[in-house]
Amino acid sequence: MCIAYEAVAWGAYVSTWQDSLRIIKKVDRANFGMCWDAFHVLARIWGSCALPSGKIEGGDEALRRSLEELVDVLRGEDGEKIFYVQLSDGEFYDPPLGEGHKFWVQGMDERLIWSRNTRPFPLESEFGGYFPIGEVIKLILTEGRFQGWVSFEIFDWRMRDEKFLPEQAAERGWKSWVELNII
């Protein structure tokens, strides 16, 4: 059995994939590795549901540096510690998250609210997705030479509707997968 440890964007102590890797190295067990979650990485250093632009100032540069570091890790001896990559998009909020927004919860970290409600399948711009997921996964698979599992983790408020069918999620997921494979 393998255990995949994952940093979350709103984490108080472990909020980046680099934090996860440090802990994984301290645990030092062959079956203890990382789930590298694109949403948490992007929501921490690149995007924001609470800003009108949807982007953190300096986010492009922070993401570039983070991905360069990830590629170095994937190509090095620690690459085997990344067990799988998890993908979703992030929905652009217009208006931005704040008091009065339908997802607003007083006292809750904005990234947690975002994560729980508006993570469509990758590349679903028709559902507000705007993260650079295509560029991210291309870099991980080509330059990083990642050959492990890739999964989708979706939290989309539209799927809570009782009229929403599992078949619809499967269709959306398949469409996303096909589009990612074209990139």
Which residue stretches match the model-derived regions?
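C-terminal helical cap(s) of enzyme catalytic domains, especially alpha/beta-barrels
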Residues: 161-183
